[in-house]
């Protein structure tokens, strides 16, 4: 199961008692700020959660799995996420009892 933006908006509606439309707009606005920062080359740091970074990957050799043909994989910029220590600790604590 995955947490969706709609579920986040519903949670805001239930916990803060704000209008559903406003809650949806808040969630959309939050993610739009992250998108815009990354598009302009900025790192996004969310204290207690983690960091979104941009990383440039060089061109590298690859192989078409169907034909076995060698093909170059283009250089590109990718978004990476590094969870913060608080998030790591909480996830580990939550999962330690499930084994």
UniProtKB/Swiss-Prot annotation:
Record's keyword annotation contains NAD: no
Renumbered residue ranges of the record's region Disordered: 49-71
Name of the protein: Integration host factor subunit alpha
Task performed by this protein: This protein is one of the two subunits of integration host factor, a specific DNA-binding protein that functions in genetic recombination as well as in transcriptional and translational control.
Any GO BP annotation: DNA recombination
Presence of the UniProt keyword Transcription in the record: yes
Signal peptide annotation: none
Similarity comment: family membership: Belongs to the bacterial histone-like protein family.
One of the record's GO cellular component terms: cytosol
Keywords in alphabetical order: DNA recombination, DNA-binding, Transcription, Transcription regulation, Translation regulation
SUPFAM superfamilies to which the protein is assigned, alphabetical: IHF-like DNA-binding proteins
GO molecular-function terms, A-Z: DNA binding; structural constituent of chromatin
Subunit structure: Heterodimer of an alpha and a beta chain.
